[in-house]
């Protein structure tokens, strides 16, 4: 990401680490040698990295421009010293602290020139001894300056091939080691202490890579390894960067290719040596992974050379590059919000008027430049050590000194005795278990209140009546109202002692809902008493007047109201005269309102209001909530008994919970126990559990466990036992298991999950699952725990991808590349001979069209190790007509490459007609051997006979054939200098591997098949199969030679008939139809079908490979279950790789995907053999686990043992392994 652009053609130097409180500063000085000088070119400026700052923080005019700048710390200068090689050939020193103040007078420390008057160029400070400065001049001298005594520099001895010194660089670990590079291709390593050369490095090239013959433009030493360095070669035709390890100085450790022109500057990341920054003449600044040799990307390009690039020593997130475009840019290695900014730029560009577009074109192009983010995490962003708890009871950890992840068992803090007390949530299922548990709680109670609570739990478990609850609080058995005074109470009610619900109904007089108040019952009582005493008191039956003259006006009004049925008016008239008795008597004939009116008036007339009046009023109004809310909470026992006596079943639990909440709010120990009593009586799990959860935090302080965690587990176990028992007693059914939010028991659910984790850590997985089953699946954290336990308890529930068998392939240890271990390989050619084509003795080579070559040979940053021991390849000369054999009647077959015996031509007869019976075709006799050859008959197994020694006098004029991809990767060893058997026959040009499923049509005229280009990515293709052994340019014979035509001195012994007959199999290979019979000779030989294998097993597998697809290409819905993991893992890895690779590799990814789709199509049609699919499954498993060594071993085994079943898709598998390894 571009942070800042400074308009200046300059050379640069970052401030060293530890200077300016590690706030990075960038020194810029005008770059010499550029045209169109400006006044600002002679300014020495200091800039900060703040993108918003558009002016230097300090500058002075030094009246000169610079070849190079260097900045290092100093013992007597807090900001260090800046050194610069001047335009006039001298060297100057400046104080950055004075430059920050723009103090020109005190900024300059000193200026010196070399003794021989040479022009000094490159500079570099010694980081271990900052007083030492190295520089090189245009006469080939390397100078060492001591800034303590700058008047006395000394020069190192001149090299034999002295020329202008382009670069000097001090070693970062050994203070007296210096490297320099000049206009020759040599990099010289110096021992400054001994003032002598230690080593000269140069690269003479290897197979496929040209020699590094240009000048050395830049040298960068590894920050941490004293023997490693990188050099940039000034060769536009072969722009390479070489990394060296001086322990093996004869060959570079790696070759970095990707620049289009020579690199001019190198800078190693100071904090993570994995990264190397380079910039060059192609206007590119690239970042490399030095360990793998691949390019990680490049910063936005410049329109001119990038002359110098440098990683910031104090902030490795920043890099600076200077270009001849007149710009110094500061970049970040991480881009942010690039997509949004580019989208906004594109929208803005589309809205610009056509007339103004070209005026804004530079800014538009700059805003849409490609962004760059480092795809690998730098070392300073990586976590050096870490650990995570795993499941069950595991610790996964890693350390900085190992790339392996360690999995260990976490120490179990739960004692064995405590673990024995763990139980499932279904522990309390019988009455005896509950009773024993409650009795144990009574015995272990620390207070009387706690013991009463345990007794109440026992009573609730036995379905005791409310009378039992009152007895526990010291009250006698509850009785119905008037039980002691009224002898006329129903005997069934008097004898009832079953349940508190029925008892409360009787005590509550049963009919309170309508006219069941005390006064209504009073009327009934009066009526009952009247009827009972009817014999003793008869109603007066004398005559009377309704309106008596002696009655007062009030009495007459009351009488009139009664006659008309207005009882309420009569009652109110009595109350106005304070005739309470009369009003009370009259209200017995009225409704509720009459009775309430009398009751309220009576209550208001009482000067002293006793509590029984308040209670009676609440009872009469059925307002028990009034008593529970307003009575003194210290009398909670009386309130509880009042609730037991008068509350209905529906009212009982809410009223008890309200009373318990009032007690819980007091927050003292005794009140908490009292609240617990009320919650138990109400059978409210929510209130009871919340109270226990509050007690859990304080109960651990009183535990006698050895540790705080042990105390927590102990108290949590007791809580779970209480909750489990309570759920069993009340037969609790949770209605919120399907809820998704607003859970009333959320606190209890969290404890369930925590306790399940403790049980899992102790190995009690079934018990843990029993508690998780009590938690809603949508509760946070529940689903994950259930899934993890399910995987342990039900292994069959794990997806099949995790049941893949482990591969038996061991990783191959990497070998050190040696120059002598790399040998050239001889190309192998392939062709097919048509059994139905008319042959001729005068035939030109077949016009075979090879597969399309790659359009470009650029590697796009993809590098291989250098190949040594093989000369550069030359383009093959045009093919010559084959030389006829001197033997009469012999065929003119040209020997194929890689073979020291004559090829055997097998000409089966035409296919049988309908009238013919199935019979084995006859095998033709092979041609006689040529001069100097020994005849070797074909073997029954179809394998080639080992070749015998060829003459050791090759034709020096024979052109060297280029390698084909098949030959380059062939694992069949061959002699590096194998000449053809005929010294005048040129070596055949290697052709591309021909797929047996393709049929090529012959064309008229003789055409030379061009050699294939070097592939963009070197992969390991499959070796040629048995059907690809013959030469592509082998002319077919005119006829089958008879034994009499053979030389008498050489009599071939034909193999037995059984070995020459094709096997009879139910599945026959696909054979192309013969062409129409024609008497005319074809202009060139037709490409033939593959010969039939001579092994039944190989025939069947080859047939299955070439079998037609059952389903259309691209369909993946019919892949069998046992093969689907192959598809899923390979496809997932392909998608990961395609997102990780840079855009330059898109063609490689596309080709890999196309080849893998061929494999997926065959998996979908289930046409691959079981041995092959087993190997592919093991390969995919290793690749998915990033075990690339094992995956490569399996791929090699597939190619070597099952190669005849492999098609073009094997190249895609091989390439996927390579790409996956490079992007991990």
Curated annotation (Swiss-Prot):
Residues 480-512, 840-866, 879-1116 are annotated as: Disordered. Belongs to the WD repeat SEC31 family. Pfam families: SRA1, WD40. Residues 495-510 have a biased composition (Polar residues). Keywords: Cytoplasmic vesicle, Endoplasmic reticulum, ER-Golgi transport, Membrane, Phosphoprotein, Protein transport, Repeat, Transport, WD repeat. The modification Phosphoserine is found at residues 1042, 1044. This is Protein transport protein sec31. Residues 914-923, 960-976, 1035-1065, 1093-1107 have a biased composition (Low complexity). It is found in: Cytoplasmic vesicle, COPII-coated vesicle membrane; Endoplasmic reticulum membrane. GO terms for molecular function: structural molecule activity. The COPII coat is composed of at least 5 proteins: the sec23/24 complex, the sec13/31 complex, and the protein sar1. sec13 and sec31 make a 2:2 tetramer that forms the edge element of the COPII outer coat. The tetramer self-assembles in multiple copies to form the complete polyhedral cage. Interacts (via WD 8) with sec13. GO terms for cellular component: COPII vesicle coat; cytoplasm; cytosol; endoplasmic reticulum exit site; endoplasmic reticulum membrane. Component of the coat protein complex II (COPII) which promotes the formation of transport vesicles from the endoplasmic reticulum (ER). The coat has two main functions, the physical deformation of the endoplasmic reticulum membrane into vesicles and the selection of cargo molecules. InterPro entries: SEC31-like, SRA1/Sec31, WD40/YVTN_repeat-like_dom_sf, WD40_repeat_CS, WD40_repeat_dom_sf, WD40_rpt. The modification Phosphothreonine is found at residue 499. It comes from the Eukaryota. GO terms for biological process: COPII-coated vesicle cargo loading; endoplasmic reticulum membrane organization; endoplasmic reticulum organization; endoplasmic reticulum to Golgi vesicle-mediated transport; protein transport. It comes from Schizosaccharomyces pombe (strain 972 / ATCC 24843).
């Amino acid at each position: 990401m571009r942070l800042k652009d400074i308009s200046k053609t300059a050379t640069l130097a970052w401030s060293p680490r530890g200077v300016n409180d590690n706030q990075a500063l960038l020194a810029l000085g005008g770059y010499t040698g550029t045209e169109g000088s400006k006044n600002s070119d002679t300014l020495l400026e200091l800039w900060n990295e703040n993108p918003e700052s558009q002016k230097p923080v300090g500058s002075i005019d030094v009246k000169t421009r610079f070849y190079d700048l260097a900045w290092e710390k100093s013992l007597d200068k807090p900001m260090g010293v800046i050194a610069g090689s001047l335009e006039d050939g001298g060297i100057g020193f400046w104080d950055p602290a004075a430059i920050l103040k723009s103090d020109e007078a005190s900024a300059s420390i000193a200026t010196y020139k070399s003794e021989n008057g040479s022009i000094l160029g490159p500079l570099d400070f010694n980081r271990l001894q900052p007083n030492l400065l190295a520089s090189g001049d245009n006469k080939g001298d390397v100078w060492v300056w001591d800034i303590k005594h700058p008047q006395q520099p000394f020069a190192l001895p001149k090299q034999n091939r002295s020329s202008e010194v382009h670069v000097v660089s001090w070693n970062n670990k050994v203070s007296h080691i210096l490297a320099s590079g000049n206009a020759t291709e040599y990099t010289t390593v110096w021992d400054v202490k001994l003032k002598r050369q230690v080593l000269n490095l140069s690269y003479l090239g290897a197979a496929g890579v040209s020699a590094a013959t240009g000048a050395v433009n830049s040298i960068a030493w590894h920050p941490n390894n004293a023997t490693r360095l990188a050099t940039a070669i000034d060769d536009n035709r072969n722009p390479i960067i070489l990394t060296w390890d001086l322990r093996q100085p004869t060959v570079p450790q790696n070759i970095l290719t990707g620049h289009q022109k020579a690199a001019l500057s190198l800078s190693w990341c100071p904090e993570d040596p994995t990264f190397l920054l380079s910039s060059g003449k192609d206007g590119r600044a690239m970042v490399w992974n030095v360990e793998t040799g691949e390019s990680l990307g490049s910063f936005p390009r410049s329109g001119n050379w990038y002359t110098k690039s440098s990683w910031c020593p104090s902030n490795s997130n920043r890099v600076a590059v200077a270009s001849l475009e007149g710009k110094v840019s500061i970049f970040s290695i991480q881009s942010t919000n690039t997509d949004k900014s580019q989208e906004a730029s594109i929208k803005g560009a589309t809205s610009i008027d056509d007339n103004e577009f070209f005026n804004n074109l530079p800014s538009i192009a700059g805003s849409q430049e490609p962004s760059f983010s480092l795809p690998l995490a730098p070392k300073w962003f990586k976590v050096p050590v870490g650990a995570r708890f795993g499941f069950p009871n595991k610790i996964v950890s890693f350390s900085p000194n190992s790339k392996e992840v360690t999995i260990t068992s976490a120490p179990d803090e739960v004692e064995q005795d405590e673990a024995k007390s763990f139980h499932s949530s279904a522990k309390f299922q019988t009455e005896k278990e509950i009773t024993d548990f409650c009795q144990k709680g009574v015995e272990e109670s620390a207070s009387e209140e706690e013991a009463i609570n345990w007794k109440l739990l026992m009573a609730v478990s036995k379905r005791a009546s409310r009378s039992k609850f009152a007895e526990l609080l010291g009250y006698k058995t509850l009785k119905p109202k008037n039980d002691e005074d009224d002898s006329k109470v129903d005997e069934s009610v008097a004898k009832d002692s079953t349940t508190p619900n029925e008892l409360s109904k009787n005590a509550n007089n049963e009919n309170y809902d309508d006219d069941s108040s005390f006064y209504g019952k009073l009327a009934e009582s009066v009526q009952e008493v009247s009827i009972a005493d009817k014999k003793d008191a008869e109603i007066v039956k004398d005559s009377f007047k309704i309106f008596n003259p002696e009655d007062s006006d009030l009495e007459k009004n009351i009488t009139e109201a009664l006659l008309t049925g207005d009882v309420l008016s009569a009652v109110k008239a009595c109350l106005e005269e304070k005739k309470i008795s009369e009003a009370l008597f009259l209200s017995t004939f009225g409704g509720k309102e009459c009775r309430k009116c009398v009751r309220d008036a009576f209550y208001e007339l009482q000067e002293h209001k006793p509590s029984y009046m308040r209670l009676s009023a609440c009872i009469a109004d059925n307002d028990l909530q009034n008593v529970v809310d307003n009575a003194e909470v210290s009398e909670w026992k009386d309130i509880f008994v009042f609730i037991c006596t008068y509350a209905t079943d529906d009212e009982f639990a809410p009223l008890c919970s309200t009373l318990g909440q009032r007690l819980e709010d007091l927050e003292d120990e005794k009140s908490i126990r009292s609240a617990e009593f009320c919650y138990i009586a109400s059978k409210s799990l929510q209130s009871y559990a919340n109270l226990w959860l509050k007690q859990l935090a304080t109960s651990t302080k009183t535990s006698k466990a050895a540790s705080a965690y042990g105390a927590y587990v102990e108290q949590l176990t007791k809580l779970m036992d209480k909750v489990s028992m309570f759920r069993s007693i009340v037969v609790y059914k949770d209605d919120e298991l399907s809820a998704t939010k607003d859970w009333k028991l959320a606190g209890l659910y969290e404890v369930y999950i925590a306790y399940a984790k403790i049980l899992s850590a102790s190995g009690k997985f079934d018990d843990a699952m029993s508690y998780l089953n009590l938690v809603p699946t949508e509760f946070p954290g529940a689903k994950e725990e259930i899934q993890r336990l399910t995987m342990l308890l039900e292994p069959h529930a794990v997806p099949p991808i995790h049941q893949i068998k482990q591969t038996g392939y061991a990783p191959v240890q990497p070998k050190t590349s040696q120059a002598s271990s790399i040998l050239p390989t001889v190309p192998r050619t392939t062709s097919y001979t048509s059994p139905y084509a008319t042959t001729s003795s005068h035939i030109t080579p077949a016009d075979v069209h090879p597969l399309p070559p790659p359009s470009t040979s650029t590697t796009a940053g993809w590098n291989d190790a250098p190949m040594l021991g093989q000369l550069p390849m030359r383009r093959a000369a045009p093919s010559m007509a084959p030389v006829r054999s001197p033997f009469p009647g012999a065929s003119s077959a040209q020997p194929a490459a890689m073979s020291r015996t004559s090829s055997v031509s097998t000409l089966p007869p035409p296919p049988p007609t309908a009238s013919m019976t199935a019979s084995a075709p006859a095998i033709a006799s092979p041609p006689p051997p040529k001069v100097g050859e020994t005849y070797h008959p074909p073997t029954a197994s179809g394998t080639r006979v080992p070749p015998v020694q060829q003459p050791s006098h090759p034709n020096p004029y024979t052109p060297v054939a280029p390698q084909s991809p098949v030959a380059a990767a062939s694992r069949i060893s061959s002699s590096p200098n194998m000449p053809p058997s005929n010294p005048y026959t040129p070596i055949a040009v290697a052709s591309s591997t021909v797929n047996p499923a393709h049929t090529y049509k012959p064309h008229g005229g003789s055409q030379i098949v061009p050699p294939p280009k070097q592939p963009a990515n070197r992969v390991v293709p499959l070796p040629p199969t048995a059907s690809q052994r013959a030469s592509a340019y082998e002319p077919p014979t005119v006829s089958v030679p008879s034994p009499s035509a053979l030389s008498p001195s050489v009599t071939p012994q034909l193999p037995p008939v059984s070995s020459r007959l094709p096997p009879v199999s139910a599945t026959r290979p696909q054979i192309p139809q013969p062409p129409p019979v024609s008497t005319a000779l074809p202009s060139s030989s037709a490409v033939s079908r593959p010969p039939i294998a001579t092994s039944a097993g190989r025939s069947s597998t080859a047939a299955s490979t070439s079998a037609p697809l059952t389903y259309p290409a691209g369909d993946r819905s019919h892949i069998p279950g046992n093969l689907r993991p192959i598809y899923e893992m390979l496809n997932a890895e392909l998608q990961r790789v395609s997102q990780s690779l840079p855009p330059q590799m898109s063609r490689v990814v596309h080709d890999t995907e196309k080849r893998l789709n061929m494999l997926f199509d065959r998996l979908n049609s289930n046409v691959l053999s079981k041995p092959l699919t087993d190997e592919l499954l093991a390969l995919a498993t290793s690749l998915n686990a990033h075990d690339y060594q094992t995956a490569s071993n399996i791929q090699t085994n597939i190619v070597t043992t099952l190669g005849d079943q492999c098609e073009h898709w094997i190249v895609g598998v091989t390439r996927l392994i390579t790409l996956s390894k490079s992007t991990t």
